[in-house]
Regions:
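Membrane-proximal helical "anchor" segments flanking the first transmembrane region
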Residues: 1-49, 56-57, 178-181
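Catalytic core of membrane glycerolipid acyltransferases/transacylases, capturing the structured
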Residues: 3, 7-10, 44-104, 131-140
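Short, hydrophobic/aromatic alpha-helical segments in well-folded domains
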Residues: 37, 61, 76, 88, ...
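Short hydrophobic/aromatic-rich motifs at helix boundaries and adjacent loops
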Residues: 8-11, 32-35, 60-63, 81-83, ...
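Non-catalytic C-terminal accessory region of glycerolipid acyltransferases
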Residues: 2, 40-42, 68, 91, ...
C-alpha cells in the first residue's frame, strides 16, 4: 500500500511540474520508444489512433509532439466539472503543442480532420469501466467477465485509421518510457471485437 500511495503522490507532483518543465527535461524524463511505428503511417499520409491505459504518468505522453513535430497530436479527454481546473489542465496538456479534444466531440472532429487531409495522432485512454448504457462488449479479463469500452474500435473501423498501442512504463522515479506497438493497419479488415481484444 505504501508503494501505491508514493506512486500516486509522485504522479500528482509530476503533473504540476509540467507547468514549467523544459522541453529538454521532459524528453529526458519521458522517452518515446519505437517512434518509427507510427511514423511509418505518417509517411504514407495516414492518421493514427494511439491507445493506452491509465498507467504511470500518462500526462507526459503529451510531449510526443516534441518527437514528431509535423503531426497534430489530439489527446481525447473528459472535461472536468470545475472550469478553472479544467482550463488549467488543458493548458498543461497543450504546452508542447498538443490539441486536447473533449470526448463528446471526438468523432465529429476526427471526421473533419480526415476530410481536410490533416495528419493526426488521436490519443485514447481506455481502461475505465463503461457506464450502464455502454455495456455492449464483454470479455474474460483476469479470469472474470469484464465489460470493456469499445469506442476506440468503433471509430477506428469507421475511419479505417491504423491503431498503435502505447505502453507507458515507469523506469525509475520521475522517469518513463512510452513504447509504441503496431496493433492494426487496417481495422475494417478485422472482425467486430477483435481490435478491442488486441489492446486489453
Amino acid at each position: 500500500a505504501r508503494k501505491y500511495y508514493r506512486h500516486l503522490c509522485d504522479t500528482f507532483a509530476e503533473f504540476y511540474k509540467l507547468w514549467h518543465i523544459t522541453e529538454d527535461e521532459i524528453k529526458r524524463r519521458c522517452v518515446m520508444v519505437n517512434v518509427d511505428v507510427p511514423h511509418r503511417y505518417f509517411e504514407q499520409g495516414r492518421s493514427v489512433i494511439a491507445f493506452s491505459g491509465h498507467y504511470g504518468n500518462w500526462e507526459m505522453m503529451y510531449s510526443y509532439k516534441l518527437w514528431e513535430k509535423n503531426v497534430e497530436l489530439v489527446p481525447i479527454y473528459k472535461p472536468i466539472h470545475n472550469k478553472i481546473f479544467d482550463r488549467m489542465t488543458c493548458k498543461i496538456r497543450s504546452r508542447f503543442g498538443a490539441t486536447p479534444l473533449a470526448k463528446a466531440d471526438t468523432l465529429r472532429v476526427m471526421l473533419r480532420n480526415q476530410q481536410e487531409g490533416k495528419i493526426t495522432m488521436t490519443g485514447f485512454i481506455g481502461d475505465q469501466t463503461p457506464n450502464r448504457r455502454s455495456l455492449h462488449f464483454w470479455t474474460r479479463f483476469l479470469n472474470q467477465d469484464t465489460a470493456v469500452l469499445e469506442g476506440t474500435e468503433r471509430i477506428a473501423r469507421k475511419l479505417n485509421q491504423p491503431v498503435v498501442f502505447v505502453n507507458m512504463r515507469k523506469v525509475k522515479r520521475g522517469h518513463y518510457h512510452a513504447e509504441f506497438y503496431d496493433l492494426c493497419s487496417d481495422p475494417q479488415s478485422l472482425e467486430p471485437g477483435e481490435l478491442t481484444r488486441m489492446h486489453i
